[in-house]
């Protein structure tokens, strides 16, 4: 049972969510990235809502959701999604995940494949190589000492093109505010999952068979085109799309460059 609060609803486990779009249509779930929240999808919803029921929610400890009551893992995040689908009596959904969200939906596909109709994995990591892996782990470890905001400005430089940063100061401040709102311990735990969780997803013993599309930005230095090629190669019949010019959070710069390939893919599946 869910309780209604102004602007969103709260599930039994404390997950904040919105269920919008076309009631009774196939469900599309949108999972945000580390230090963000469900509102990152606000410019994608209009295009999706005409044909789909949309479920956006905050990861545990993020946005308006409660902090997790146990150690944060990809499996815990997958269980959060499972519980929400059960709570809403949604038997099957297409799940779109950005960055760590694309790790969560892969974990969900490995653990609960019968609950998925499709996957869209956006700007999500694969094997990083030793040097890049060490850098990501160092960054994640520093958060425990210095706090989440210590790496914020460097993150914005990695995430957005210089011209977009300069001409959209309001959006930059909104992204900062999303991170400020994350429970500090939850952020540190999630950062470590993002840094180290890839190893449990690569080369799985039983490959993901859910129809999938893998998308990243040409200039994403953390979830590179080569990583997306590798992710797609490990999923049977996965499609691949590389969006030119953009960086890690390109889906906030050019929403339709990401939403339209997802919509086209879902239509091919008659969803």
Please identify what each model-predicted range represents:
Residues 75-93:
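Conserved acidic catalytic loop of the alpha/beta-hydrolase fold
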Residues 1-28, 50-53, 90-91, 199, ...:
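Alpha/beta-hydrolase fold catalytic core
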Residues 130-134, 146-206:
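Conserved alpha/beta-hydrolase catalytic His-Asp/Glu region
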Residues 13-67:
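Conserved HGGG/HGGXW glycine-rich cap/lid loop of the alpha/beta-hydrolase fold
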Residues 238-271:
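Catalytic active-site module of serine/aspartate enzymes centered on a nucleophile-bearing elbow/loop
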Residues 218-223:
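Acidic catalytic loop of the alpha/beta-hydrolase fold
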Residues 106-111, 115-152:
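Flexible "cap/lid" loop of the alpha/beta hydrolase fold
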Residues 208, 214-216:
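Short beta-strand/loop motif that positions the catalytic acidic residue
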């Amino acid at each position: 049972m869910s309780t209604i609060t102004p602007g969103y609803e709260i599930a039994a486990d404390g997950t904040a969510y919105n269920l919008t779009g076309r009631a009774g249509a196939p469900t599309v779930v949108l999972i945000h990235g580390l230090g963000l929240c469900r509102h990152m999808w606000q410019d994608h919803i209009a295009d999706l809502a005409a044909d789909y029921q949309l479920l956006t929610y905050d990861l545990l400890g993020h946005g308006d959701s409660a902090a997790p009551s146990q150690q944060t893992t990809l499996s815990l995040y997958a269980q959060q999604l499972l519980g929400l689908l059960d709570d809403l009596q949604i038997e099957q959904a297409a799940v779109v995940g950005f960055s760590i969200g694309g790790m969560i939906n892969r974990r969900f596909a490995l653990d609960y494949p019968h609950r998925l109709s499709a996957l869209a994995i956006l700007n999500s990591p694969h094997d990083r190589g030793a040097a890049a892996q060490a850098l990501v782990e160092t960054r994640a470890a520093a958060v425990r000492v210095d706090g989440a905001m210590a790496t914020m400005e460097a993150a914005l430089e990695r995430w957005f093109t210089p011209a977009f940063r300069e001409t959209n100061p309001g959006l930059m401040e909104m992204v900062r505010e999303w991170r400020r709102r994350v429970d500090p311990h939850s952020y540190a735990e999630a950062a470590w999952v993002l840094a180290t969780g890839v190893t449990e997803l690569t080369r799985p013993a039983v490959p993901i068979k859910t129809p999938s599309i893998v998308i990243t930005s040409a200039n994403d230095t953390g979830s590179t085109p080569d990583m997306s090629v590798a992710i797609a190669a490990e999923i049977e019949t996965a499609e691949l799309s590389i969006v030119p010019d953009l960086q890690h959070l390109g889906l906030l710069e050019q929403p339709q460059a990401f939403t339209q390939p997802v919509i086209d893919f879902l239509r091919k599946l008659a969803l």
